[in-house]
């Protein structure tokens, strides 16, 4: 039986590819997709969800737009990474359908309420929508199997020296998620920076030759340009968000540890840092499964295999 999931995202090139991977995988049943502000403004990320589902001919999936700003802060976007549209590069179709006439939190709550079994929430942007759901619907916590997030890092940040972008945008929301008591799986930079797509991988995807694999290759062409900056020391482009979906499909590709994680919301230099108690120094019980390594080739092979679904 397929695993029911709710996808909350802020497309974003890697979010878009996470959607492609999820919808090519019969092991997953995508119940709804909600958008969050982050990689671009809330209007643009919502439009990008609709554009991707139009491309994939999955306009049957309910979509709703989420919070327009973080819980307690002004919005920061990553237009320097993802371009003016949030999905610069390929020519994507205009949406052929409209979002639901409700908020992201309302759609999430409705989906959880109507599900016969607990639902896995996959969140690949800032955690604002998920935190609002948890705060406003405590009665639905038992309907959430786990929350799989792309965010954070045990070591170096990518937006500040200490913080990864998604957590930095709304650290208060991320702290609510980690301390919710619901199982959390964290795909942080420690693993996503190892999930790099090289130029030859992009050409492999392009050679698959269907319309979706071509779009994915063109998304990666654009995404790679930002990551060519020598400061990163990358061979390719880290495909952050699809690690969440890949873990659900093939957890054996990943090395994980069980640890306590907290989020710094006040630090002068460390705001948005995920503090991972790797050496059990706090006495706190683990609240997260933290990904620390990935079989890069296995990850690339999985994506290539699933892109053939769209032939």
UniProtKB/Swiss-Prot annotation:
Its EC number is 3.2.-.-. It comes from the Bacteria. The keyword Ligase does not apply. Gene3D superfamilies: Ribonucleoside hydrolase-like. GO terms for molecular function: purine nucleosidase activity; uridine nucleosidase activity. GO terms for cellular component: cytosol. One of its GO terms (biological process) is nucleobase-containing small molecule interconversion. InterPro entries: I/U_nuclsd_hydro_CS (IPR015910), Inosine/uridine_hydrolase_dom (IPR001910), IUNH (IPR023186), Pyrim_hydro_RihA (IPR022975), Ribo_hydro-like (IPR036452). Pfam families: IU_nuc_hydro. Keywords: Glycosidase, Hydrolase. The active site is at 240. Hydrolyzes with equal efficiency cytidine or uridine to ribose and cytosine or uracil, respectively. Belongs to the IUNH family. RihA subfamily. This is Pyrimidine-specific ribonucleoside hydrolase RihA. It comes from Escherichia coli O157:H7.
